Amino acid sequence: MALTMLLLLVAAALTLIETRAGPHSLRYFHTAVSWPGLVEPRFIIVGYVDDTQFVRFDSDAENPRMEPRARWMEQEGPEYWERETQKAKGHEESFRVSLRTAQRYYNQSKGGSHTLQWMYGCDVGSDERLLRGYLQFAYEGRDYIALNEDLKTWTAADMAAQITLHKWEQAGIAERDRAYLEGACVQSLRRYLQLRKETLLCTDPPKAHVTHHPRSYGAVTLRCWALGFYPADITLTWQLNGEELTQDMELVETRPAGDGTFQKWASVVVPLGKEQNYTCHVNHEGLPEPLTLRWEPPPSTVSNMANVAILVVLVAWPSLELWWIL
């Protein structure tokens, strides 16, 4: 059992996903947390296909439901989400009971902060057949009990976990878990991979615009935004009178928007009043042709630009700095 699951550390979860064997994986991470003053423990589920979070449940949400976190999961109908929500709420209740049980096993008071975590899933090969299944529990961030690789026996981390091990052996829990991991887990992963494959055939073009951000000393930042595009591969460049400004451009990494699409921006610092000499160029496979954009000042700004330029020259330097901060 080489698992040290820390509360809601998604980066660690992704590291586990990327280093495990198998071309494709389905994993679920369940976490219940109690702390003083909390009426009921907070319960969170996140599900991953490979390195992509595709579902999430949070008991602290206004209307707790299993929700899609990947665009391709939006193809699932209301029946699927209702079924998954009911399963999540069932797991939530089981976790509350198990959290109290673990506190009793370790002779802990009810008033402290406690964490119970559960990770399970399956890996399939390129032929979509099972490579391995796994199921592990952690309590207070430390290993508690895990299903062994044979999917038939358990390893308990300490004496308290031995109590659980004996209970589960008598109840035949390993056989039930093995049936799920070898059956429904693999079938679900195959379905999700198919949904993702169908979505990969679609593209969403970026929605692009340029924003204007004043700086000190008579300069401004022009930032070119590309939002809501899919897939993630995109090119943003700035040009001055037709020449690329690669060296003078700040470019951020492409980031997920949280709805299955992506966003990115690129910026340059330019002299005040010279903004129209700069163009942003956006290239993405969802576009029929690359976009070329300039900053478009509001009508009121255009009419007053000469007055603003004169004012900037006349004001004292401390006032200019204050105007920039505001």
Curated annotation (Swiss-Prot):
Superkingdom: Eukaryota
Subcellular location as annotated: Membrane
InterPro entries recorded: Ig-like_dom (IPR007110), Ig-like_dom_sf (IPR036179), Ig-like_fold (IPR013783), Ig/MHC_CS (IPR003006), Ig_C1-set (IPR003597), MHC_class-I_related (IPR050208), MHC_I-like_Ag-recog (IPR011161), MHC_I-like_Ag-recog_sf (IPR037055)
Segments of this protein annotated with the region Alpha-2: 112-203
Gene Ontology CC entries for this record: lumenal side of endoplasmic reticulum membrane; MHC class I protein complex; phagocytic vesicle membrane
Keywords recorded for this protein, A-Z: Disulfide bond, Glycoprotein, Immunity, Membrane, MHC I, Signal, Transmembrane, Transmembrane helix
List of glycosylated residues: N107, N277
Every Ig-like C1-type domain range: 206-294
Signal peptide: 1-21
Segments on the Extracellular side according to the record's topology features: 22-305
Membrane topology of the entry: Single-pass type I membrane protein
CDD domains: IgC1_MHC_Ib_Qa-2 (cd21014)
Subunit: Heterodimer of an alpha chain and a beta chain (beta-2-microglobulin).
Function per UniProt: Involved in the presentation of foreign antigens to the immune system.
Name of this chain's protein: H-2 class I histocompatibility antigen, Q8 alpha chain
Organism: Mus musculus
Gene: H2-Q8
